[in-house]
């Protein structure tokens, strides 16, 4: 049986940064869990918006990959991973595509704020490696995700969602369906 030992690779890696990385891992896994819930809500037979389901499933996988990237960083820097319980999503019935997109936008802004705070901590602790990692792998991607979700919310509202079921059907078919061709 081995006990947790101090790392031989740890250098210029503050305990506060290590703890903040563990919190960010939990937040990324929570976001993945929320998106997974959204995906399977839209996959239900009484909702049947398959491209919303695909879109949110893709987002779930992205968030899980973000968590895994942070876990890899934690090990590379000589930190220790301490996983916490993942909070359940705030709701099970996402009501509409518009509501889900609004919730996703709020979630991404929270994730982004947490990353900005992590970057500030890394700056305060004089950790250029962590700053570079966050800038390279997260910040620009977050801004793009927030913009995309904001655009989706705007377009759904312009189309008359959620009052118009046809709006969400057309958005599912023509906007989210077309995104398959861009990937």
UniProtKB/Swiss-Prot annotation:
Which residues, renumbered to this chain, carry the PTM N-acetylmethionine? Answer: 1
Q: The Ferritin-like diiron domain covers which part of the protein?
A: 11-160
Q: Which residues carry this modification: N-acetylthreonine?
A: 2
Entry GO MF terms: ferric iron binding; ferrous iron binding; ferroxidase activity; identical protein binding; iron ion binding; iron ion sequestering activity
**Catalytic reaction list:** 4 Fe(2+) + O2 + 4 H(+) = 4 Fe(3+) + 2 H2O
Residues annotated with Phosphoserine modification: 179, 183
Q: In which tissues is it expressed?
A: Expressed in the liver.
Q: Which Pfam families match?
A: Ferritin
The enzyme class is oxidoreductase
Q: Where does Fe cation 1 bind?
A: 28, 63, 66
Q: What is the recorded phenotype of mutating residue 87 to Q?
A: Reduces iron binding and oxidation rate. No effect on iron binding but the oxidation rate is severely reduced
Localisation per UniProt entry? Cytoplasm; Lysosome; Cytoplasmic vesicle, Autophagosome
Q: What is this protein called?
A: Ferritin heavy chain
- Which lineage ranks, top first, belong to the organism behind this chain? Eukaryota, Metazoa, Chordata, Craniata, Vertebrata
């Amino acid at each position: 049986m081995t006990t947790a030992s101090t790392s031989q690779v740890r250098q210029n890696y503050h305990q506060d940064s290590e703890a903040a990385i563990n919190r960010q891992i939990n937040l990324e896994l929570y976001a993945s869990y929320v998106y997974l819930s959204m995906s399977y809500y839209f996959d239900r037979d009484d909702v049947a918006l398959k491209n919303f389901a695909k879109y949110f499933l893709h987002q779930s996988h992205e968030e899980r990959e973000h968590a895994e990237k942070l876990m890899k960083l934690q090990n590379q820097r000589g930190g220790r991973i301490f996983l916490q319980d993942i909070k359940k999503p705030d709701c099970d019935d996402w009501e509409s595509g518009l509501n889900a997109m609004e919730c996703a936008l709020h979630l991404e802004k929270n994730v982004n704020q947490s990353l900005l705070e992590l970057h500030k901590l890394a700056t305060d602790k004089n950790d250029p490696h962590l700053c570079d990692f966050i800038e390279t792998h997260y910040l620009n991607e977050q801004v793009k995700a927030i913009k995309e979700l904001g655009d989706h919310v705007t377009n759904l509202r312009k189309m008359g969602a959620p009052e118009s079921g046809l709006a969400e059907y057309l958005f599912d078919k023509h906007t989210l369906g077309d995104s398959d061709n861009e990937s």
